[in-house]
């Protein structure tokens, strides 16, 4: 079912980052009713810019660190739901790339996303009388083909791809659908300088810069196309300016 952004209420976690900010720009152009940005660092200039792009959209900001306890995530979301009454789309976009920081990489890239998703299910789960909703999880192409010099980052993204697939299959029970957004190498600060695991390749950032890349604008435009297509369980690859579905190969089935 197509997801029409006009008049919708959207929460965007990390909506002020590289890909995040350009995606926020594209989202406000599409005319949702509310865009609620949750990010670790406030950027008043960016919020003002987003509001100016489309004055009919209400853009609000709440400080949010995805590594807080689950109870804190629930508390923040309750504040938002109390104000807006309904949320139609949650975008989970927080991420770091630094394999020196093993625990934080897992905490931000995976555990924080799981907790934010778990928190919003308190309000969306149809078993609790909720209306359901849609989740777009920003993962990475490294989630299905690792950059082996950054195995911690790659593994954290693979975990999110797997988690998203499970959430999608649970849609008949919860009423919540989900799909993953997997950008290829995109020109952001994330890939300009970062650390490989155990410094196995000190030049990994430089080497990646030699790989075909895409702009954050091109990635953001395809992100919005994926939002509008709204295919539950889709694994979208956003690479070199293209939007392509990834066909996942099933090697085993639990049978349950």
UniProtKB/Swiss-Prot annotation:
Enzyme Commission number(s) of this protein: 1.1.1.1
Residues where NAD(+) binds: 12-35
GO terms (BP aspect): alcohol metabolic process
Binding locations of substrate: 140
InterPro entries, per database record: ADH_Drosophila-type, NAD(P)-bd_dom_sf, Sc_DH/Rdtase_CS, SDR_fam
Annotated active site: 153
Domain of life of the source: Eukaryota
GO MF entry, a single one: alcohol dehydrogenase (NAD+) activity
Catalytic activity: a primary alcohol + NAD(+) = an aldehyde + NADH + H(+); a secondary alcohol + NAD(+) = a ketone + NADH + H(+)
PROSITE patterns linked to this entry: ADH_SHORT (PS00061)
Keyword set, alphabetical order: NAD, Oxidoreductase
Disulfide bond residue pairs: none
Pfam families, per the entry: adh_short (PF00106)
Enzyme class: oxidoreductase
Cellular component terms per the entry's GO annotation: cytoplasm
Subunit record text: Homodimer.
Family named by the database record: Belongs to the short-chain dehydrogenases/reductases (SDR) family.
Protein name: Alcohol dehydrogenase
Phylogenetic classification of the source organism: Eukaryota, Metazoa, Ecdysozoa, Arthropoda, Hexapoda
Gene: Adh
């Amino acid at each position: 079912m197509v997801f029409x952004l006009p008049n919708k209420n959207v929460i965007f976690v990390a909506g002020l980052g590289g890909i995040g900010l350009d995606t926020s720009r594209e989202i406000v152009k599409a005319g949702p009713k509310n865009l609620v940005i949750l990010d670790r660092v406030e950027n008043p200039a960016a919020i003002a810019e987003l509001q100016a792009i489309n004055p009919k959209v209400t853009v609000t900001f709440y400080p949010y660190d995805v590594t807080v306890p689950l109870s804190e995530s629930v508390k923040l979301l309750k504040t938002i739901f109390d104000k807006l009454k309904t949320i139609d789309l949650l975008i989970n976009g927080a991420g770091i790339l630094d394999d020196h920081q093993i625990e934080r990489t897992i905490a931000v890239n995976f555990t924080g996303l799981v907790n934010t998703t778990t928190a919003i299910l308190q309000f969306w789960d149809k078993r609790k009388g909720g209306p359901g909703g849609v989740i777009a999880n920003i993962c990475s192409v490294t989630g299905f083909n690792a950059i082996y010099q950054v195995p911690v980052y790659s593994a954290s993204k693979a975990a999110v791809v797997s988690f998203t697939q499970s959430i999608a299959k649970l849609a008949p029970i919860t009423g919540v659908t989900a799909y993953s957004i997997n950008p290829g190498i995109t020109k952001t600060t994330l890939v300009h300088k970062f650390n490989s695991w155990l410094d196995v390749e000190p030049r990994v950032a430089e080497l990646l810069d030699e790989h075909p890349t895409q702009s954050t604008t091109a990635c953001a435009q395809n992100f919005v196309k994926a939002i509008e297509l709204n295919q539950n369980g889709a694994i979208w690859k956003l690479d070199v300016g293209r939007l392509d579905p990834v066909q996942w190969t099933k090697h085993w089935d639990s049978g349950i």
